[in-house]
């Protein structure tokens, strides 16, 4: 039950950097609005509960959280946010899944298509790459705090799929249907995750050369800078020399 996903490691590093950007507030507020469409009580709505936790992690003010919930439930105007997934290709034929939350579908699809095309990629048809990814619950734990054996002991009993070596952290992968049970098992054991998310995990990754890797990272950055883009997933793996340059 081991492996190493450098791409996933980059995602987590970028996630920590994202918290410093003003976009983080917009991103978590939109997720709360969408989640609250399923009910405004976080006790009964696990997605809303996770969205509120993510909002608190980036210090979104309490009144902003409450406003976003009310927009989602329809108590306030401004809840017309649509959740969509675009599929396409980046440089080197790398598969991309792009999750967006938008109040204007036409604007967003045009912007995402432009970013992909400008980067040497292309927008694809629905279903063209989605089959290459599996939806997983992902719980990330710091290596300095927990061993792989600790996490496996708790996770396997609760129903986790795998424990992945992410470099400076462990990632526990869970089938979405078991996500709440596995999260609860770790919480009851006093084992605290750095992050908890539902992610589209590539079934296989493609290692790319340094030049292609840099192009792909620029594409990821351009997509993530778009206000409507919530998450970006891709199936490439970065060579060590590219990672070393990123550490400089």
From Swiss-Prot:
Region described as Disordered: 1-22
Principal subcellular localisation of the protein: cytoplasm
Pfam family, one: Transcrip_reg
Cited Gene3D superfamilies: 1.10.10.200, 3.30.70.980
GO terms for biological process, alphabetical: regulation of DNA-templated transcription
UniProt KW DNA-binding keyword: yes
GO CC terms of this entry: cytosol
Listed HAMAP family: Transcrip_reg_TACO1 (MF_00693)
Protein family membership: Belongs to the TACO1 family.
Protein name: Probable transcriptional regulatory protein Dde_2325
């Amino acid at each position: 039950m081991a492996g190493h996903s450098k791409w996933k490691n980059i995602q987590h590093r970028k996630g920590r950097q994202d918290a410093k950007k003003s976009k983080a507030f917009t991103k978590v507020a939109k997720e709360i609005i969408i989640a609250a469409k399923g009910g405004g009580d976080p006790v009964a709505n696990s997605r809303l509960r996770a969205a509120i936790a993510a909002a608190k992690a980036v210090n979104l003010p309490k009144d902003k959280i409450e406003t976003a919930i009310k927009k989602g439930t329809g108590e306030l105007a401004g809840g017309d946010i649509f959740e969509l997934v675009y599929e396409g290709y980046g440089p080197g034929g790398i598969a991309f899944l792009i999750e967006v939350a938008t109040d204007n579908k036409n604007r967003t699809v045009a912007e995402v298509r432009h970013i992909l095309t400008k980067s040497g990629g292309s927008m694809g048809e629905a279903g063209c790459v989605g089959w290459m990814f599996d939806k997983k619950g992902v719980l990330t734990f710091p290596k300095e705090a927990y061993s792989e054996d600790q996490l496996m002991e708790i996770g396997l009993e609760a129903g986790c799929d795998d424990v992945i070596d992410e470099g400076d952290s462990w990632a526990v992968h869970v089938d979405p249907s078991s996500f709440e049970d596995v999260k609860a098992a770790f919480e009851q054991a006093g084992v605290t995750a750095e992050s908890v998310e539902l992610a589209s995990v590539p079934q296989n990754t493609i290692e790319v050369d340094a030049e292609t890797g840099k192009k792909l990272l620029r594409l990821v950055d351009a997509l993530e800078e778009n206000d409507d883009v919530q998450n970006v997933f891709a199936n490439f793996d970065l060579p060590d020399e590219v990672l070393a340059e990123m550490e400089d």
